[in-house]
Amino acid sequence: MSGKTVIVLLSGGLDSMVCAGLAREAGARIVALTIDYNQRHRVELESAARIAAHVGAAEHIVLPLDLRRFGGSALTADIDVPKDGVGTDIPVTYVPARNLIFLSLTLGLAEARQAADIVIGVNALDYSGYPDCRPAFIQGFEKLAALATRDGDQGVRFHIHAPLQHMTKADIAAEAARLGMDAAMSWSCYDPTPEGLHCGACDSCRLRRKGFADAGLADPTRYA
């Protein structure tokens, strides 16, 4: 990736922060894309801005897309965020087709910037079971990108890099430390308190806390 323009889908979470750090380490010219989808945890947008500045992104685009108009998720509708542990079923925090929507927008930006590399922080090990985080989805989207774009029609091969896909949350926390990324810049909680703290009980908080504990690292997160 050295010297290449790379589009990093930057939510502001720990995973996307590590992806941005990896792109910086590779010497890429980073264009960060953050989607403001009117999510419950909009505080992550502030984290995304801090991370983009920290990695020296050439551009940081914040794109508004009001998915509350769709609803259907605890992150985009008046549905309680579950706090009873990480289960085996797909939870109500799943946002319908979110990564498909976000990657489609990222692909459009990549083609507009004449970039063929996209980085996304999906994870298929320590995660909430979302179907759009699985390897088959990423592989399928690469094929779609070749069929759906002018550049693809002209032989450009888009690469969807998911460097964290087979890492545990402990691996990801350790990678953040190796990269010199301050994890306190990132935001994971789905249901922040009015005081601006991580709730400590939603799936995302539980996975984050467990990751730091399993890695034997101090967790800089402020929990309620």
Curated annotation (Swiss-Prot):
Residues holding ATP: L10, S11, G12, G13, L14, D15, S16, M17, V18, C19, A20
Keyword ATP-binding in annotation: yes
Claim: Lipid metabolism is one of the keywords in the record: no
Pfam families in UniProt: QueC
Cofactor: Zn(2+)
Co-factor note (free text): Binds 1 zinc ion per subunit.
Superkingdom of the source species: Bacteria
Protein name per its UniProtKB record: 7-cyano-7-deazaguanine synthase 1
Reactions performed catalytically: 7-carboxy-7-deazaguanine + NH4(+) + ATP = 7-cyano-7-deazaguanine + ADP + phosphate + H2O + H(+)
Residues bound to Zn(2+): C189, C199, C202, C205
